């Protein structure tokens, strides 16, 4: 898995919520993003610049984040992002500290491989789930989950329960459809004409 470095500055939390809201608003107005690191001995509140998060957030890849907070380095993963509902700017980011002995839960991108038999017959391949939720030790988690669809015929699907990857536990519903070859209107018309 790729890694990316993000530098932050620790911040203290105000005891009263009105002071906290004012402090967070000031951080955002100055081009910063309030962040929280969970999973360690204690919860760490820190601030990162918008530019420092750009390469981590706006990418199709998944990363192990080398967080440097006031000179102290920890490995973490991006757990959650909150965006402004109108401006689409980043409001808040949660990170989760990695423990090499404990499994983590992450969403991993899905990549389809091969030319499906159903596509050759006039169907259309549709990817229903772009990411799958997996649980494993962080050093086992791949950058992407590859699914070979060359055997997939017209009207056929690949479900989560049919997939297995060594060392990974898939957490999505077993009956959830990952990808399918759907009949196009042209293929339906040709099948109806052939049936007459």
Curated annotation (Swiss-Prot):
Q: What's one GO MF term for it?
A: 5S rRNA binding
Supply the alphabetized keyword list: Ribonucleoprotein, Ribosomal protein, RNA-binding, rRNA-binding
Q: Which GO terms describe its cellular component?
A: cytosolic large ribosomal subunit
* GO-annotated biological processes: translation
UniProt superkingdom = Bacteria
Q: Which InterPro entries does UniProt cross-reference here?
A: Rbsml_bL25/Gln-tRNA_synth_N (IPR020056), Ribosomal_bL25/Gln-tRNA_synth (IPR011035), Ribosomal_bL25_b-dom (IPR020057), Ribosomal_bL25_C (IPR037121), Ribosomal_bL25_long (IPR001021), Ribosomal_L25_dom (IPR029751), Ribosomal_uL5_bac-type (IPR020930)
Q: Which SUPFAM superfamilies match?
A: Ribosomal protein L25-like
Under the heading NCBIfam families, the entry gives: bL25_bact_ctc, PRK05618.2-2
Family, per entry: Belongs to the bacterial ribosomal protein bL25 family. CTC subfamily.
- Subunit relationships: Part of the 50S ribosomal subunit; part of the 5S rRNA/L5/L18/L25 subcomplex. Contacts the 5S rRNA. Binds to the 5S rRNA independently of L5 and L18.
| Functional description taken from the UniProt entry | This is one of the proteins that binds to the 5S RNA in the ribosome where it forms part of the central protuberance.
In Swiss-Prot or TrEMBL terms, this protein is called Large ribosomal subunit protein bL25
Source organism of the structure:
Bacteroides fragilis (strain ATCC 25285 / DSM 2151 / CCUG 4856 / JCM 11019 / LMG 10263 / NCTC 9343 / Onslow / VPI 2553 / EN-2)
Chain's gene name: rplY
